[in-house]
């Protein structure tokens, strides 16, 4: 086999291997990626299709806590959605602050959250370190 053909064969083999590796990585990531939508974008998505993340602000005086769940309104200052969450809220969760919720849309006005993330700015310092 000539040197030129051998080099072409090795290059083709490396290209095929890298193509397969990229394909498998992207396929795996597709199943695990959870996109970040605004409230307005999330409302128009098909209900309950997949796990999504929605970001916005907690509406003032909208937080209702009872024994089994927390209910609050979240807005992007364009539209709002009611969020239902069962679990412990993060310590930085408060009204009029940023929040990202992960879960599924139940209907166009209710979001069932599995996880709640409180957003903060780059100057955040935990109380322990202050």
Swiss-Prot record:
Task: Please list every transmembrane segment annotated in the UniProt record, as residue ranges.
Answer: 8-28
Membrane topology listed for this record: Single-pass type II membrane protein
Report a single Gene Ontology molecular function. Answer: heme binding
Q: Which InterPro entries match?
A: CcmE (IPR004329), CcmE-like_sf (IPR036127), NA-bd_OB-fold (IPR012340)
Q: Where does the source fall among the domains of life? A: Bacteria
Residue ranges that the UniProt entry lists as topological domain Extracellular: 29-130
Tell me where in or outside the cell this protein is found. Cell membrane
Coarse class of the protein's main subcellular location: membrane
Biological processes per GO annotation: cytochrome complex assembly
Binding of heme, residues: 120, 124
Cellular component per GO, a single term: plasma membrane
Per the record, the coiled-coil ranges are none
Which Pfam family would be a valid example here?
A: CcmE
Q: Which UniProt keywords apply?
A: Cell membrane, Cytochrome c-type biogenesis, Heme, Iron, Membrane, Metal-binding, Signal-anchor, Transmembrane, Transmembrane helix
Its annotated function is as follows:
Heme chaperone required for the biogenesis of c-type cytochromes. Transiently binds heme delivered by CcmC and transfers the heme to apo-cytochromes in a process facilitated by CcmF and CcmH.
Give the family per the record.
Belongs to the CcmE/CycJ family.
- Provide the protein name: Cytochrome c-type biogenesis protein CcmE
Species annotation: Wolbachia pipientis wMel
* GN (gene name): ccmE
């Amino acid at each position: 086999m000539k040197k030129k053909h051998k080099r072409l064969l090795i290059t083709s083999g490396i290209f095929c291997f890298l193509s397969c590796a990229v394909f498998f990585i992207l396929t795996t990531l597709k199943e695990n990626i959870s996109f970040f939508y605004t409230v307005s974008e999330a409302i128009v998505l098909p209900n309950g299709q997949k796990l999504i993340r929605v970001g916005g602000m907690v509406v003032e005086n909208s937080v209702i806590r009872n024994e089994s769940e927390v209910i609050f309104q979240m807005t992007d200052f364009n539209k709002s959605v009611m969020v239902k969450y069962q679990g412990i809220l993060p310590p930085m969760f408060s009204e009029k602050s940023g929040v990202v919720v992960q879960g599924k849309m139940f209907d166009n006005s209710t979001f069932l959250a599995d996880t709640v993330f409180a957003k903060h700015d780059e100057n955040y310092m935990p109380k322990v370190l202050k």
